[in-house]
Amino acid sequence: MVLFHGLEGSSRSHYAEAFAAYARQQEHSYVVPHFRGCSGELNRGPRAYHSGDFEEIGWILSRLRERHKGPILAIGISLGGNALLRWAEEMGGQASRFVSALASVSAPLDLAASGRAIGRGFNRQVYTRMFLASMKPKALEKLAQYPGLFDLRAMQAAIDLYDFDNVFTAPLHGFRNTEDYWERASALPQLRSIRLPTLLVNARNDPFVPAAILPDQQRVGEYISLWQPDQGGHVGFARGAPPGELSCLPEAVGAWLLAQR
């Protein structure tokens, strides 16, 4: 099992550790690759990572395929889920050469819709601030590596993800601006291109992914199974009294993936 983490996540994220516990229980090998800059070590290139980073996903899966001859089951969480779906869309029928099945959990399938949701109300006051507090210092470290890489003042003035993506994420990764990035990196428009067993998990009360944009079965095609529970939040799916027990998600997703081998 290989898990691709979410925005500013890591192998220490609660969901990564919950899936690790499930993999140990099932006696399966398990790996969490870190997107660039998320391991605690600054990457060396003039770039970071983004929601449509399918080339990075492909490079990692190719290396895993070279080293592991058995089935590979891929899981993507939030940003990692969207990027994993974009990889499967780009690969089409070739994706099954690398993985047997994949699951996406709480992926922001429509980045513009999620960007608007994160930029409003409580989300803006809490989550936007949290993300920027993590990403801005990394951007400064990147600028120290590559002077002139982006507009320092504009980055420091960014008050939401739209602003940050416009000055940092988009130009560093080949996009014209935030709109171009969000449009081209969103997995939603091309889901019917996927040609291997895929599970899309999205809670209908996810504060980052509006229920109105979630696809129905007709839109996604025959290779994709949808699980859209009323509750679950954003990568929550806890059971029991708060703060809840987190094994529900890996048990459900893991069982589905193992059945596809």
List where the protein language model places each region.
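Short beta-strand/loop motif that positions the catalytic acidic residue
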Residues: 194, 200-202, 206
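Alpha/beta-hydrolase-fold enzymes
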Residues: 68-172
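Short beta-strand element of the alpha/beta-hydrolase
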Residues: 1-6
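Conserved loop-alpha-helix segment in the C-terminal half of the alpha/beta-hydrolase fold
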Residues: 204-225, 229
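Active-site nucleophile elbow and catalytic-triad environment of alpha/beta-hydrolase enzymes
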Residues: 167-190
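Catalytic nucleophile-loop/oxyanion-hole region of alpha/beta-hydrolase
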Residues: 36-73
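Catalytic histidine-centered segment of alpha/beta-hydrolase-like enzymes
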Residues: 232-247
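Conserved alpha/beta-hydrolase
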Residues: 9-12, 20-44
